[in-house]
Every structure is written in structure tokens, then in C-alpha cells.
Amino acid sequence: VTNDDGVHAPGILALKQAVDPLGEVFVIAPMVNRSAIARGITIRDPLVVDEVEMGDGTLAFAISGTPVDCVRLGALGLIGAPPDVVVSGANLGLNLGDDVTYSGTVAAALEGVMLGIPAIAVSQDALGGGSGPGLDYDFSAVTRFAARLVPLACAARFPRHVIFNVNGPGVAPGALAGARVTRLGRRVYDDTLSLELESGSTRHFRIYGEPMSHDMQPGTDLSAIDDNLLSVTPLHFDLTDLAGMDHMARWEVDVLLTSVIQAD
């Protein structure tokens, strides 16, 4: 079990407790919040590993690196044999549409499948909507649902290059309308650049934006959340655009290369 909010975040404890009955559970998570770090890894500095106590008294590995570092450490021997499954979350806030390319939660799961380990990413909206610390969350439904998905993710018949991206709406479990298998929608942010401090030639900026538009078309993850449904989206790490390849097949790339060589 890992996350990007940090080893002491409430969501990872809830997820760990939900999957505890399934077998031996190891928690390997960042020491501090590493949200929106995507697939960043540590390559120049040593990774510091410390054992810390979680809220239920069990021990976890706290890592100085990123969520992807956590998965790599687990797969490469920190816990002995590689894990049978990686479950990442439960994130404080949704990871829908465009968010998945930024998300450390989703990246950790993708790293799992890239290493041949089935994986699930889990995210939860705050009650009433919103994300981040200081808000109220109910992780019970989304984490129990993720635990039920673990045997399916591990099934030999399921493609090993695919993760389940699970998102829970910001409602109490009794208000859930069900669950839906979805595709990614679009969540475009209206970003602004704010100058917060200026001292001589040094300036401090903050980039921030609220979602400007949502793709609420039927079948999208955003539409499911809007309908108070749990959303489950299969994702994979192959970013190839097959339609683009078909279009580019008409390009004479050899001719382009020849012209480049002749120009030199």
C-alpha cells in the first residue's frame, strides 16, 4: 500500500485497514506530501527509509522519495519478495480526466504494472466536494470497494498492463447511487500566475487554477462522480495514439530524413 499524500495521511490508513483481511500488508509511503509529482523518481540522492507507527499502531516504511520510488523499493527487495498487488491511495481528492497525468497516486499504480505487478489507484472526494487536508472525508466505501477489486486485478485473465483507477464521490456511503466502469473525461483548469513576493531579481510565483470545464459526456469518470457513482477506469501506460500512427503512415518519413541528411 502506498500513496502520495504521505505516510500519516488518513486515506492510506483507511485503505490499509480495508485490505488487511486479504493477506500480509506492507505500507511503503513518502515521509511527506508528494502530491502531483506524477512519475518522478529519485536518481541522484540516496533514499532514506524509516519505520514509523501508523494511527492503528502498526508499522510502515516512510520513504524520503516519491510514490514511484516507494513501489520500486517494494518490488526490488525492501519487503523481501515483490508484492502480489500494489494499491495506491486513498488520495485526498479526486483523480479524474486530465488529473491522472499529474497524480502521484495514479503514477504509483502505473509503476506497479510496469514492473509486472497488478495495481489499483484509489481517490476520494471530500464530503460536499473538494480536496486536500482539513476537509472531511469518508473513505469507507471507496476503500472497501478497492479491496473487493484486488482479486479481480490479480486474476490471470485480466491484462497485466492495466490498472483500475477508482474514484469516490463526496457523499456518505448511504447516498451512493452505485458504481460504473468509465473512460477518462476532460478536466481543464483555468490557471493563473500570481506574483507573491519580489526581492531584487528574485520573484516568487504561484500557479493555481480551478477546473474551468468538465467533460460530462455519458460514460466519463466525471459524469459518474456527478451522478454520485463510484467510478472505475481502466488505464494503461502505453500512450501510443494508434489513430495518429495510421495517419502518419501516409507521411514519407524516409524522404524527410533524406532531406535532413542532405541539408547537413
Model-derived regions, located:
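Electrostatically charged, flexible surface regions
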Residues: 137-264
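Glycine-rich phosphate/pyrophosphate-binding loops
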Residues: 113-138
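A cross-family phosphate/adenosyl-ligand binding-site feature
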Residues: 10-77, 81-82
